UniProtKB/Swiss-Prot annotation:
The gene is miaA. It comes from the Bacteria. Residues 41-44, 165-169 are annotated as: Interaction with substrate tRNA. GO terms for biological process: tRNA modification. Substrate binds at residues 18-23. Its cofactor is Mg(2+). Keywords: ATP-binding, Magnesium, Nucleotide-binding, Transferase, tRNA processing. It catalyses: adenosine(37) in tRNA + dimethylallyl diphosphate = N(6)-dimethylallyladenosine(37) in tRNA + diphosphate. Pfam families: IPPT. ATP binds at residues 16-23. Its EC number is 2.5.1.75. GO terms for molecular function: ATP binding; tRNA dimethylallyltransferase activity. Catalyzes the transfer of a dimethylallyl group onto the adenine at position 37 in tRNAs that read codons beginning with uridine, leading to the formation of N6-(dimethylallyl)adenosine (i(6)A). This is tRNA dimethylallyltransferase.
């Protein structure tokens, strides 16, 4: 018989920077405690992104059930709010099967939505988005940013003119809903009250993390990232709108797209992937440190906890 809703064991959440070892540790924990894994990675959900998204191997997917891997195609909208709602539903279903849950991933808004809830924002409006993207091309990002400053100064303060996808999404929400993003966020939907989270973030010394990032990029290139990026470029980059699909605005692909267009040499593109990935890791660490109450823990300490207590 399934355990009652009020007596489920806690949900282990393992966040942290890219290349910090979250996925491997999540696998070890899941095998130890008999858990299924929820991937909190906004790129692994797409079928078309494999090497550059650092997906688990087919063998790992066979050994432990994973969720939110290969479930969407590029171009299908899937927001952090969508993830939170579906993740809560799947956690409930996993609990009903008397299984444990491990959440692993570094997508900051996915982890935040899962743990804290999310604002009930309107779904993507393709017509509005395409018009805003055209305005971005013709007017520039600063003009759109100043529009957001007038319409929702609080939301504008959380980003800048370089964050074009968040900028367009903010303006799209305002036009779709007729109200500010800030007002919608104030009516945030919390996670189910009977969920208990054990939220951790995996810590690595910066130099070690950066070495791992550089090595991961080299490994991705050796494993066929160039071929994967070329296939994506030939399939999806005919128009400006396709090129700027959220899924394709991913470190590792954008730099190689620039190489295909002759804007960088291959060596320059690889070095840029490493640099941009290090920058991304730094932003992840800053976000997780400032916005979420996570317990920062080294891998050896986490392994010891699992071995001794099993959560």
């Amino acid at each position: 018989m399934a355990t009652s809703a009020m007596h489920h064991p806690p949900i282990v959440v393992l966040a942290g920077a890219t290349a910090s070892g979250k996925s491997a540790l999540a696998m070890a924990i899941a095998k130890k405690i008999g858990a299924e894994i929820i991937s909190a990675d906004s790129r692994q959900i797409y079928w078309e992104l494999t090497i550059g998204a650092a997906k688990p191997s087919p063998k790992e997917l066979q050994e432990v059930p994973h969720h939110f891997i290969n479930e969407k195609h590029i171009g299908e909208p899937f927001t952090a709010g969508d993830f939170a709602v579906e993740a809560w539903q799947r956690i409930t279903a996993i609990h009903q099967r008397d299984k444990r849950v491990v959440v692993a991933g570094g997508s900051t808004l996915y982890v935040e939505g899962l743990l804290k809830g999310f604002a009930n924002l309107p779904s993507a409006n393709e017509a509005i988005r395409q018009r805003l993207e055209t305005e971005l091309q013709t007017l520039g990002s600063e003009a759109l940013y100043q529009r957001l400053v007038k319409l929702d100064p609080t939301q504008a303060a959380t980003l800048d003119a370089t964050k074009t996808q968040r900028l367009i999404r903010s303006l799209e929400i305002i036009e779709s809903s007729g109200t500010s993003v800030t007002a919608l966020k104030a009516a945030q939907q919390p996670p189910p009250s009977h969920f208990t989270f054990l939220p951790f973030a995996l810590f690595l010394p910066r130099e070690t993390l950066y070495q791992r990032i550089n090595q991961r990029v080299d490994d991705m290139m050796a494993n066929g990232l160039l071929h994967e990026a070329e296939a994506l470029y030939q399939t999806y980059c005919d128009t400006w709108q396709e090129r700027n699909l959220s899924a394709l605005r991913t470190v590792g692909y954008q730099e190689l797209f620039a190489y295909f267009e002759g804007r960088h040499s291959l060596d320059e593109a690889i070095n840029l992937i490493k640099q941009h990935t290090r920058n991304y890791a730094k932003r992840q660490i800053t976000f997780f440190s400032n916005h979420l109450a996570l317990r920062w823990i080294e891998q050896a300490e986490m392994e010891e906890i699992v071995e001794q207590h099993g959560f």
